[in-house]
Amino acid sequence: MSRIAVVTSHPLFASSGGHLVIANALVTALQEFGHEATVVLTPQNRFGRQGAAYLSTWLMDLGQAYDGRPVDQVISFRYPSYAIQHDSHVCWINHRMREYYDQWPRFSRSLSWRARTKERVRRALIHAADRYLLEDCVTQVYAQSHTIQARLARWGRLSAEVLHPPPPPRPYRCDRYGEYVLVASRLTPLKRIHLVLEALRLPPAQMVRCVIVGDGESRDWLIGLTKEYGLENRVTFAGQVSETELLEHLANCRAVCFPTTEEDYGLVTVEAFASRKAVITCTDSGGPTELVCNEKNGLVIEPTAKSLAIALARISEDSALAESFGVAGLRQVTAMTWQRAVDRLLLV
């Protein structure tokens, strides 16, 4: 039996993100396969103090536990958790600090010249630190998607094998193909939930109902759009829900819509498949497009309101189509096992 520390950063008072769900799922899998495992959370400081978060993580001692026994291996996730020092260190990365990588143009656009200059310096330092840590201080790097793998290669010329996370070990089920499409996501601009609302107001999708699960900075704006578009009778904002409530929605929705842009992975995709539900996503959605095969287990459409409206209408009007896609998705995700993931991640 090995003793494994699963390490990830997490913002203070933030609700559980996908990285934390995957970390906890990995711990559960490790324990089921006879190992001793725990999640270790490292700081993720606000802008201007990222260096301190990297340093404090670098100085954290994970060499041995309270009882004097050694920690045999570390498996880290997102920045700056991979700054942990350990002789047996695998990084299963879901992302670096995206504001300094693929999201730099969007992030820096609104900054003053003075702030942009300061952030350029920080960006260069973070790039250098990330490359050193992932190239020289980690035994093995796995990317959670081909999208992440491509970013590592583009910014830093870092190589990584791809290992998609399986669905978390939850009691998924399919009760029916109900009368609404489910959106389960943080409500932030990159998730592009407004595209769903814009699609629902178009003629093809004017009979489609939608339940939106999740919370975030865009919530008030999205609620305002819903009222502006006259969609109050067809769109329900369920807010942050428990795991039980999420599984209930997955079991009873017609399909899952995830129109995100440049997503790292998109855990809801495999959770939908595990619930025998189709997924609608967009051609530029990143991670989900690696799993959703157009016209086989879901629909991959252009990121326009018109295309999404047509896709929503097709799924909503044809329960047999939704079911056939869902069955194909379940078949695909069944092959993604935690046994395989653990076998690849373990060095000891």
Residue ranges and their predicted role:
Residues 223-241:
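Nucleotide-activated donor-binding/catalytic signature segment of Leloir-type glycosyltransferases, i.e.
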Residues 283, 293-306, 314-319:
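Conserved acidic donor-binding segment of nucleotide-sugar-dependent glycosyltransferases
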Residues 240-241, 248-253:
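Short alpha-helical donor nucleotide-sugar binding micro-motif in glycosyltransferases
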Residues 278-282:
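Short hydrophobic beta-strand element within catalytic cores of glycosyltransferases
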Residues 261:
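Aromatic "clamp/platform" in nucleotide-sugar-dependent glycosyltransferases that forms part
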